[in-house]
Amino acid sequence: MIVDTSAIIAILRDEDDAAAYADALANADVRRLSAASYLECGIVLDSQRDPVISRALDELIEEAEFVVEPVTERQARLARAAYADFGRGSGHPAGLNFGDCLSYALAIDRREPLLWKGNDFGHTGVQRALDRR
């Protein structure tokens, strides 16, 4: 399973639906995170200036045994195409941002479902991890 930044942030901020994302993580055979998404999570959490939540990211990555995947050339090309098709400036309802495009690309490249929060990826046709449970 590929995990998008949005799902990790929901868990670490203990949002209302955090349990659904935490359960999905716990039940997955493998949890993959793009290196770009790892950085994006860090940027989002570090902007809160709370060292506890900042450390919680690395603790989650370690405890849940995430595989942090480097961005390959193929994924970069898939992400570029995703931005052209589904990006914020494309007029498409998905409105994917930079990090979203890299999560999408990793899911397409690995042919694995994507765990995300929100409605953006639902407009792209990528397989949703929560639908598999």
UniProtKB/Swiss-Prot annotation:
Residues 1-124 form the PINc domain. The keyword Oxidoreductase does not apply. GO terms for molecular function: magnesium ion binding; RNA endonuclease activity. Its cofactor is Mg(2+). It comes from the Bacteria. One of its GO terms (biological process) is negative regulation of growth. Its EC number is 3.1.-.-. Pfam families: PIN. Keywords: Hydrolase, Magnesium, Metal-binding, Nuclease, Toxin-antitoxin system. Mg(2+) binds at D4, D100. The keyword Metal-binding applies. Toxic component of a type II toxin-antitoxin (TA) system. An RNase. Upon expression in M.smegmatis inhibits colony formation. Its toxic effect is neutralized by coexpression with cognate antitoxin VapB28. Belongs to the PINc/VapC protein family. This is Ribonuclease VapC28. It comes from Mycobacterium tuberculosis (strain ATCC 25618 / H37Rv).
